[in-house]
Amino acid sequence: MRNLEDMKKSDNIMSSDAKEGTENIPDIDKVISELVNYASENELIEADDKIFIVNRLLDIFEKNGLAEDSEIIKNSGVQELNNTRPIADILSDCLKIAVDNGLIEDTQLNRDLFDTKVMGAVTPMPSVVRKHFKELYNNNPKLATDYFYELNKACNYIRCDRIEKDQKWKYNSEYGIIDITINLSKPEKDPKDIIKQGKFAASGYPKCLLCKENEGYAGNLSHPARQNLRVIPLELSGEKYYMQYSPYVYYNEHCIVFNDKHIPMKINKSTFKKLIEFTDMFPHYTLGSNADLPIVGGSILSHDHFQGGAYEFPMARAEYVYTFK
């Protein structure tokens, strides 16, 4: 049997561990304040939106209010901060709070669903984004895409901390310079998530990852969250399309232009007209199409779409073998 002194030591150690664990959990009021400041600094929200956004975030964290000694209350609102941390660090604290309070299970899928929900609360409404994009486009198309691309990074739809893990290099082959990339930004699936996904009944809404209904969708075990996704409407050859950026950015400003309707990919004369019309609209961008053949792989053939961006592909640098008129 343990003597009284040993028991006291053990209790002290347990108390110390518990205290240390509590201290490691970020203060929710401070994290909310920092997140709202981040959104303001990155022009995701206006100053008049701050209190409204604080209350949206309190709802997400299932918190009824702020502590009486909260900086937000003491200063009668969210105060501007200097040197706001990168969004990945702020969201890391959000996830620690969510896990500690039992709001989510600590798996990669649940973490992604939750932090996307958080960012959705500070991402501008689609109408706001489209209006500003159009205003900039009327002045200069590049200004419009610059704004839209920076927005996607600021609202964490493009997860820059993950994109940085990708490996890219060039190889000087006998046929010319080859661009080689290894995409490491897609997180590995947690075994717990895989088991749950197998039991989850998908709703069929949205029909695929390229449907317009993804904009603002909360996601679930079989479909990623898209509360921070925003898309820009376009018209190509009389048909309605939308432009968004790829969250994985295989190359600079990797954009996706997808059909308003969930229809299969089909390469025909109209395809080339649409590609040319797009590059007329955005001269600083390239646009291309995957083959409509299943053997090629890698593309969502069930939904008509194109891919492009501000990138010079090796094919554009290749010499002509012959020319014809």
State the predicted function of each range.
Residues 2-265:
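Active-site microenvironments that recognize anionic phosphate/pyrophosphate groups
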Residues 229-230, 262-287:
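Helical scaffold of the NTase/Pol beta-like nucleotidyltransferase catalytic core
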